[in-house]
Amino acid sequence: MAALVRTGQLTATELCAAAIARAEAVNPQINAVVYALYEQAQQRAGAGLPAGPFGGVPFLLKDFGAQYTGAPHTSGSRALRNFVPTEDAELVRRWQVAGLNILGKTNTPEFALMGVTEPV
């Protein structure tokens, strides 16, 4: 996907819109995206993303360990339902520098302890 953006065959905005459309189409059935950041992702794509190796590639963060400023970070637990980080995790910062465009956060089993996701 990054190669398509890099070579101009697709814009980051077009790629972002396609990823959002797909997520919106399937999420009602699979409940994967628990916190959407679609509007912000579209703004970032339009404003220009870092030209790292993944420049323009849409990306979803697992809601465990990947703290993202302003987005709830519950680790799948009711106990953390009101926790909203004020800074990004180092890994998230590195992903952004690499050019990934964060679309939202995905479900996780409570504290990632189970092999299945039956979130609250």
PLM feature spans:
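Gly/Ser-rich catalytic/binding loops embedded in alpha/beta enzyme cores
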Residues: 1-120
